[in-house]
Amino acid sequence: MGQIQLLDEVHAQRLQQARHLFFDQGDLPEGLVDPLIVRSWERCRRFGIGETSMTPTTNAMDRIALKTEQERNRFLLAQGRPIMEHVFEQIRESGSMVILADANGLLLETVGDADFVNRADRVALSAGASWDENLRGTNAIGTALSEEAPVAVLGAEHFLEHNSFLTCCASPIFGPDGRLLGVLDISGDYRSQQHHTLGLARLSSSIIEKRLFESVHARDILVCFHSRPDYLGSPKEGIAAVSPDGQVLAMNRAGTSILGIRQVDAVRRDFSMV
């Protein structure tokens, strides 16, 4: 038996114990599951969701309404679609799908292996459905939006029992102005989970953010920087949009993180003084 399989079995046992403590006894399963998952479970309890609650298993909106929302999010879709397709090429035939959702958890577009897509459709994991946490319970899309952080939700970490066949990894996408725009998610069957998937989701969301920033500031002077030269040209590089007179017009999240400043503190300052 391989080490990964042993770790998966240990995780499953700890998760079963955690669910018993939380759902049957009302106690917090401290140390048994990720604190982020526990926070989400607590939010779901406050929402009044039960672990066996039945949520809508059909799309919440018709094609016309979905088209309207896709048009509303056309900027995100234009920059996100090529990345979705590239990610899917990396995981094709692994029983997975790639999802792009908006800031409210509405699934805008999906691409995936047909067999898994058909299974996912039975729990409304398809375009036009909302996976907001207050509707679907703990899930990577809704929880990543609530936490504004990358999230992996594996099997029975999902609040609702009928979603426990899923393993989902999602990473939020922020716009050039720092506003939360949506989330990129990679979902598959819990039994065939890949341990690199969360990293792939994080990298993909970073690439989309970079594309969004460069698109908005295509006519500005872009200054790229990083403390490590080998990171230049990667999604980890800082980018500042600068006016001809050297004023910072905007800076991406990677840039403000590198410099340890807030975006609002970088804007309208001379780049040489940032």
Predicted stretch roles:
Residues 157-175:
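Helix-to-coil/beta transition segments that act as allosteric "coupling" elements at the rims
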Residues 113-116, 120, 255-266:
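PAS/PAS-like sensory domain cap-loop motif
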Residues 158, 247, 255:
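Short, glycine-/Ser/Thr-/acidic-enriched flexible segments
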Residues 141-142, 265-274:
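Terminal output helix/cap of sensory domains in signal transduction proteins
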Residues 1-134, 139-152, 165, 174-245, ...:
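Intrinsically disordered, low-complexity terminal regulatory regions
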